[in-house]
Amino acid sequence: GVNAVGKTTILDAIRYCLTTNRNFNALGNKKSGRTLQGSVHAKQRGENAYRRPGHTVAYIGAEFWDSVKHTSFVIAVRVESEGPMQELHPGDQTWYISEDGITLEQLPFIDPRTGAPSAKEDFKPAEGRLSYTRSPSEARDRICRALGIGRAASPLGKKFNEVFQMGTSMDE
């Protein structure tokens, strides 16, 4: 596809949601300097300017279909940041896994009254539940189990998390 339209940003976001890995743009040019903070605050390419320079919240979600149970479920992450130069702390990131039967459309990523990202306490489906954790290592473990991989520390869990680190750049 055309350069600079967001393909790698989407891949980075999905990878972060599913693996908790904050090393962005591993799939492209490792010298790009892209970061989670830069993506959350919409850093302008090649400039030190941000479209969202102040406090901001970003959600990333992925919906899965369980072919054995014949139902969907969602894995999502919420990142809250005070500013692009502030270091993220563990409490600034929350990973969610829905119970069976929940779809992306059932989660209020956006507050319908304000058009802004939903507050943490409002991020829940009208029916059903979400489990959550702020610990990246616990999130990795829960995500691997939800995907049927087993524990993140198992050989298959380690392989799953490694596969997302593989680069696809022509320069490598």
Report each predicted region and the residues it spans:
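Phosphate-binding glycine-rich loops of NTP-binding sites
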Residues: 1-37
